[in-house]
């Protein structure tokens, strides 16, 4: 088993996919993103947790793309665009601690460019 749960956290939806190590999508879906005005980071992680539990037995780690100024090496999120409740937090560390899996984050624009470079447009 070398599958990973990949999230693309956006302002309207959190899209996710179960992917293998060759970036083949095995399953995909989306859930609504908790709105900043009404919710906070606990609601955000609760939504992610439901998805993680669905795939827990099939995954080795979590990857997340999201807006904002991020340090992908440390997992720290300086700004987070519409996901303002995540600004100033270490999102990768939080994911790893909450779900007991290795986790990485990267800026969504960089992820799109890397995916296109690797797999094509």
What is each of the regions a protein language model found here?
Residues 41-42, 61, 71-121:
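Glycine-rich phosphate-binding loop and adjoining helix at the ATP-binding site
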Residues 1, 57-59, 100:
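A general structural motif
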Residues 42-55, 91:
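Short, well-ordered amphipathic alpha-helical segments that serve as non-catalytic structural scaffolds
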Residues 4-8, 59-63, 104:
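Short glycine-aspartate micro-motif
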Residues 12, 67-70:
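Short glycine-rich anion-binding loops that position phosphate/pyrophosphate groups of nucleotides
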Residues 19, 70-71:
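Hydrophobic alpha-helical segments, especially N-terminal targeting/anchoring helices
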Residues 2-43, 76-77:
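Short glycine-rich, Thr/Ser-proximal phosphate-binding strand/loop in the N-terminal lobe
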